[in-house]
Amino acid sequence: MRSKIIALLLLLSCMLNVNAQDDNVRTKSVYVEVLGPSNGIGLTYDARFNENSRWGYRVGFGFGYKRTSDIFGKTSVRGYSVPVGVNYLVGGKKHALELGAGLNAGIYNNHDFTFEPWYIETTPGNKKQIGWKTKPIKENKFGMFAYTTVGYRYTSKKGFQFRAGVTPAVAFAFKGIHDHKVVLAPYISFGKAF
């Protein structure tokens, strides 16, 4: 009888322990994000405002790189940015619709070129333009875009987190860097919730 009571208590203890783990609310996470608000690849910290809140915030660091080439030369842009935002989760603890909005501000190292006249000296002191040549330009510029996110968020019982969705964004303060004013970019992320 005594062994049955001990076995019953151990079983009850295990069930309570498992139940307590299921009720564990994971309000914080760290994830690696590709595209979307990170503007390339980024590392982000995300948290709920409190344990029972569906509202949360995110802050991270992003890096983006773009390179193009044509018959005139090569251009590249490296971006180092900080995406910050708020989000709201609709659904359960495991599967949720994530709706968010925020700003991404950063410094963009722009390597570009411009055209300048190409002259030859015809006689001493006289020049004649015979064409155009490219001149490299290197400059750092400030850039910013406002974004929203609409996506799916999966958080397992053990803390694995997967996110995927789309980021509509409006670029401003990107003079000479970004050719598009409105961008629609997908995103995907993998991380750990705790």
What kind of region is each of these model predictions?
Residues M1-K4, Q21:
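Positively charged n-region of N-terminal signal peptides that target proteins for export
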Residues K4-C14:
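Sec-dependent N-terminal signal peptides
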Residues L16-A20:
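Sec/Tat signal peptide C-region and signal peptidase I cleavage site
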Residues D23-V25, V34-S38, G73-G79, E139-F145, ...:
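Transmembrane beta-barrel outer-membrane domains
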Residues N24-S38, R54-R67, A164-F174:
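Transmembrane beta-strand segments that form the barrel wall of outer-membrane beta-barrel proteins
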Residues G40-D46:
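N-terminal secretory signal peptides
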Residues D46-F160:
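Gram-negative (and chloroplast) outer-membrane scaffold detector with strong preference
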Residues V182-F194:
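Outer-membrane beta-barrel "beta-signal"
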